């Protein structure tokens, strides 16, 4: 494989401000806008009801992030019209895995309040739009947002914050109205200029020209960017995202007859969307050959790399988990340094104790204490408390970006270590609380979200089939052989429970289906979480390494304040092959097996099991690319087909069985390695002016067919920095690696850097030899593993009879 490097231009962008007018009018509560949604509140406590509404609708002002900061600061582009155009309603689920909003309609359809696409700027008509559309191109919607009449749950008077309700204004939750896809919310853009829009697109209903690229000259950097990056023309809507965008999906117990047209009774907010193409959504306005597309969009359905924006140069997409039996999740005693509620602050710095202005007794004190906490995320990295982990999700999806975290994330093309945003710096929770009203609005209501989480119960297969547990056992024994469920239980006790049970040994005496008796707060909660939640070294589980090397919670990284002090001090797995390991420690937390029948394929990256895909009518939005390769990592000549999305009970069950076959027979798994399906251009260095005024910037071209991980987990900045040190300050390079590499490895490092430098010949283009490419991967890749569906071979030595029995038993959990 040859890696080609060349010089090319990198464009800059501006945002122009427009003057706006003001309208006024009464806001409407979200529950009154959607009776179908409100029906789901009937069985909930006031606190859980409030938490559900926040989970489904609150964006916490991240619409600004996706409209401005995402493109201008991080180089990402989203073509919202490509996703959300009313005429694409039938493809929302098939192309993007999005859940269509049952309350929205296509303008012009019978019984739809909007009669033309001009009225809605090409989008669907949704509840609340009669008010919202009045503010397109005008100021004033912030006070008319449905969040402003959000019905708060009763205030908790038992905390140090006292008995007076001093919660941040609910307006700062920022709901907007639906886009037609649940979890994606729209807001009127006060900067919108209808005349500019008509001139560009020919109609208020169209966005077509807005998505076209700025230049047809392939030699120009503008050929890789479109109007989404051009601030001189702004769209009619700003689009925000709630947590529900990734977690709302179809209820395994009541799936829709037509997934393209669900009813509210088919929808659950906590099951996790295993069909979601949110990664492709976030890159929908970019060409596949640019770096940002590769970093963001390289994910199969149902997984997303949550560190792609606060980039840690580790490609580690993970599943959007179902949230079941929250109160049964194990907790562990850890050293936790965090902010806790206080009624007053002594004299001292605000960095350790701070009281909110114009509030009484509403203070926060930062201190260290031993505290029982959950292990959240795939490696247990979120480890200072469940409430804090929930709030961090809002930052991961763009909330408080300008006030709190954009200046802590790296610029992908900052090549000078002394340059601002060359690398990560830690997010400051105290500073964000002080400066971002949306932080406080969410934080003041985290208890409500937790209360909503506590309502989720497993989706049992017997309930999905409408039969009793005894009848299900009889069906499974008939399918897999007499006595299979009981034999499978014995196999589970012997081979699985050590990792996949939260109860104590001896497991022979454990009832894995038991519920907590007479629990008035969380009725029918299962006793067993079906995971011990203890992080396991990667070498033990053996699955794809990417997620275990996630490093954003380590010291000096962006989410450092969200990690327990002792948990992040775990040793690096000594058997990792990477020579200079990234900051990740190399651990995985065993996933819960609750309702495992409904959530195949398996593993943190959905890679063990058949590939699944939607079947969109618009083939330009068909993102399936076969990952199947031969032993030489070349595309398989006749790869297995992907299975179509199927949310039905039988569809989930059949996918479960096929995935279990691959899990328990690892030698039969077809090899999966994601390859670049287009040439990839990586703009590395900023523009410089050379002779005759020519502007150029360093760029790397990765050819089609290269394993995507060669790029996605490459610390190319470190490599460039080391080349400079080798040339200008070799003593400093020696000191940098003295405590990391052996003398032999340090000599090999210098020799490799010299070889790479020698191949940087004068001219606009040069090639790297295979030897240099191998050196770069060995020394500068955070993840050397390429096979995505390897590992977890624990059941391979079971007999065929035991394997089939285990599948039968797992179907009952």
Spell out what each predicted region is.
Residues 11-22:
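Bacterial N-terminal signal peptides
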Residues 4, 9, 23-813:
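Periplasmic c-type cytochrome electron-transfer domains
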